[in-house]
Amino acid sequence: RILANLINNVTSLDTLNHELGHCVYDLGISTELPFLDRKASSPAVTEAIAMMMGDIIKIENVLDKIVPDELLERFKMTHKEDEASFVAKSLLIIDFEREIYTNPEQNPAELWQNLSKKYLNRENEQDNEWASIPHYLSHPAYYQNYFRANLMKVQIYNYLKSVLGNITENYKSAEFMDKNIFRYGASIEEYELIKQLTGNEFSASYFCEEL
């Protein structure tokens, strides 16, 4: 069961695919594992799978028969820009949280302004935009998982594509991911799982090469 506020647009389609990514991961975890291992390898890995599923509408042919060619091409071209933007915004959010815990007496609006200039090259007046980030309260210190997941998902997807082709067009994709990723749950540490799956150590180079 998924709780999500959806409307008829691509952002909601991304959201739905993202949450379904979490679902298929959880469903694929072996029930024969010890109870404490019946969860994702790490928050970053389950986010990587979810983010990869969210990206499917831009990196595979899911919408080819639905959206006009010219519009679809422009839509897919936004993917790299979105990826670069996400990295910059993530670094802003993560750095702000670290700095505010290090020195909680400082002015958060001033800190946000300085970091916005550093990471986004954005000059803005001091305000409380930082307070609009729900993760600071709901999931403290969690955003670094999204950042690492954004790197992991590319390495995972590139490997899956090398074996399966477009994963949405290969009926063996679900079985392959169940067998090689999901079923292990938390019995394998996140970086060990990446290496076992792809044959290579976790690296940001795969993400950088995609930009």
Please report, for each region that a protein language model flagged, where it lies by residue.
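Active-site metal-coordination segments of metallo-dependent hydrolases
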Residues: 36-49, 82-85, 140-146
